[in-house]
Amino acid sequence: MDESALERYFEDSIANDSGFILEEELGLHSPALSSTQDSTYLSGRAGPSRESGAELDLSFLPDDLSTQEELGHHDNTAQAEDRAVSQDSAVCLDYDSQNSATPAATFDQQNPSLLGGGVHNSPFYSMTPMTPMTPMTPVTERSGIIPQLQNIVSTVNLGCPLDLKFIALQARNAEYNPKRFAAVIMRIREPRTTALIFSSGKMVCTGAKSEEQSRLAARKYARVVQKLGFPARFMDFKIQNMVASCDVCFPIRLEGLVLTHQQFSSYEPELFPGLIYRMVKPRIVLLIFVSGKVVLTGAKERAEIYEAFENIYPILRGFRKQ
């Protein structure tokens, strides 16, 4: 090839390059050249550049996925900025926190599902633990009411046989009617009590308001019998029954109470106006009235009366008339 041919070839190449540059500046593209460049670009993107680890073109994916990628990138950037700020001084921390407050607030308003530091992004939501309800028991709800003792029944053994007719004739404040009741009925004023004296030497004392009064009254009756010439002794004193009463100060629905506690209670208003409640532990019988008055009987110690009332009080509160 001669030199003139080479010169013509280089001149044509230069002319073609200058024309291409001019077309680009004027915004003119030939279809053939554009298709060639697009195919070259796509082949280059599909080939070596993917192997080199460059990012893929995700423009053909749905908008939701692209938005999630952008939000994830934004979240990672914000976390990186927070870590960087935590390493700076206190002054820089205040300044950066003020600047970063606006985009964080905007991001939370636009995406309420991402609030809470990313907790709601996980498939498992943190649940607030529920406080178990503790059932009401007599220990947790004190009534503040103390039943008052009304009567104490005690027994004692005088240890000798007695002539009841002679005792009734010699003693004052004594009566004896064997046709009606086979015992001498004797009364004293202090403490105000009544005694039933049997021919076997057994005696029952009733009417005392406390354990001490009951014992004192029984000793006085034994002394009277001893003064009449009988070798009476004071043996086996024992309290058999204690009766107490109180007022809960609110009316009670006895019909609902007997339906709920059929196993322990009975209510026959035509026969007796009060509900009879038989408590198992302690073994106490309660008479409950509509007015709120409660009578407790069957106890041998004060503690049993107090325990029984504290057990029944929450139940009565549940059936209070509105």
Swiss-Prot record:
One Pfam match: TBP
Chief subcellular location: nucleus
Biological process annotations from GO: DNA-templated transcription initiation; embryo development ending in birth or egg hatching; embryonic pattern specification; hemopoiesis
The entry's keywords: Developmental protein, DNA-binding, Nucleus, Transcription, Transcription regulation
Biased amino acid composition, Polar residues: 32-42
GO cellular component, one term: nucleus
Annotated region (Disordered), positions in chain: 31-54
GO MF annotations, alphabetized: DNA binding; transcription cis-regulatory region binding
Keyword Repressor belongs to the record: no
Compartment(s) where it occurs, according to its Swiss-Prot or TrEMBL record: Nucleus
Database matches in InterPro entries: TBP (IPR000814), TBP_CS (IPR030491), TBP_dom_sf (IPR012295), TBP_eukaryotic (IPR033710)
Entry keyword Coiled coil: no
SUPFAM superfamilies for the chain: TATA-box binding protein-like
Biological function: TATA box-binding transcription factor. Members of the TBP family are differentially required to regulate transcription and development during early embryogenesis.
Similarity remark: Belongs to the TBP family.
Name of the protein: TATA box-binding protein-like 2
